[in-house]
């Protein structure tokens, strides 16, 4: 299996650093991408980093990942709580799926406590800020190393 990992970001994450910084922090999505690529290089992972406000684009990237990727690290954002379609797409992916949330969704509004994505995710990281992405990449890399023996 390849060392390719898709890092997928859902709606409004293009506004990271500008939208509700008291919840999501001041780092931008470009900062997150830079950090993911740097860690990926260190861990021997190839990173494909995408963001979309459109559900179908995220689904298309999940379908694309089925053919080539070892893992998906995904912050589905608001689609976490609403998208059976993303869950169905993730259920077609055989690699590792790590769900990431910048904030601790369990300390927030009740509707944020439910995740369709968690029903497929191999792990969920919430409340660690943008470091959650890096933790997710480290987990995928560890599982790949263990699979190699």
Swiss-Prot record:
<protein>
    <recommendedName>
        <fullName>3-dehydroquinate dehydratase 2</fullName>
        <ecNumber>4.2.1.10</ecNumber>
    </recommendedName>
</protein>
<feature type="binding site">
    <location>
        <position position="81"/>
    </location>
    <ligand>
        <name>substrate</name>
    </ligand>
</feature>
<feature type="binding site">
    <location>
        <position position="88"/>
    </location>
    <ligand>
        <name>substrate</name>
    </ligand>
</feature>
<feature type="binding site">
    <location>
        <position position="112"/>
    </location>
    <ligand>
        <name>substrate</name>
    </ligand>
</feature>
<dbReference type="InterPro" id="IPR001874">
    <property type="entry name" value="DHquinase_II"/>
</dbReference>
<feature type="active site" description="Proton acceptor">
    <location>
        <position position="24"/>
    </location>
</feature>
<feature type="site" description="Transition state stabilizer">
    <location>
        <position position="19"/>
    </location>
</feature>
<keyword id="KW-0456">Lyase</keyword>
<feature type="active site" description="Proton donor">
    <location>
        <position position="101"/>
    </location>
</feature>
<keyword id="KW-0028">Amino-acid biosynthesis</keyword>
<comment type="similarity">
    <text>Belongs to the type-II 3-dehydroquinase family.</text>
</comment>
<dbReference type="GO" id="GO:0009073">
    <property type="term" value="P:aromatic amino acid family biosynthetic process"/>
</dbReference>
<comment type="subunit">
    <text>Homododecamer.</text>
</comment>
<dbReference type="GO" id="GO:0003855">
    <property type="term" value="F:3-dehydroquinate dehydratase activity"/>
</dbReference>
<feature type="binding site">
    <location>
        <position position="75"/>
    </location>
    <ligand>
        <name>substrate</name>
    </ligand>
</feature>
<dbReference type="GO" id="GO:0019631">
    <property type="term" value="P:quinate catabolic process"/>
</dbReference>
<comment type="function">
    <text>Catalyzes a trans-dehydration via an enolate intermediate.</text>
</comment>
<comment type="pathway">
    <text>Metabolic intermediate biosynthesis; chorismate biosynthesis; chorismate from D-erythrose 4-phosphate and phosphoenolpyruvate: step 3/7.</text>
</comment>
<keyword id="KW-0057">Aromatic amino acid biosynthesis</keyword>
<dbReference type="GO" id="GO:0009423">
    <property type="term" value="P:chorismate biosynthetic process"/>
</dbReference>
<dbReference type="InterPro" id="IPR036441">
    <property type="entry name" value="DHquinase_II_sf"/>
</dbReference>
<dbReference type="InterPro" id="IPR018509">
    <property type="entry name" value="DHquinase_II_CS"/>
</dbReference>
<dbReference type="GO" id="GO:0008652">
    <property type="term" value="P:amino acid biosynthetic process"/>
</dbReference>
<dbReference type="Pfam" id="PF01220">
    <property type="entry name" value="DHquinase_II"/>
</dbReference>
<feature type="binding site">
    <location>
        <begin position="102"/>
        <end position="103"/>
    </location>
    <ligand>
        <name>substrate</name>
    </ligand>
</feature>
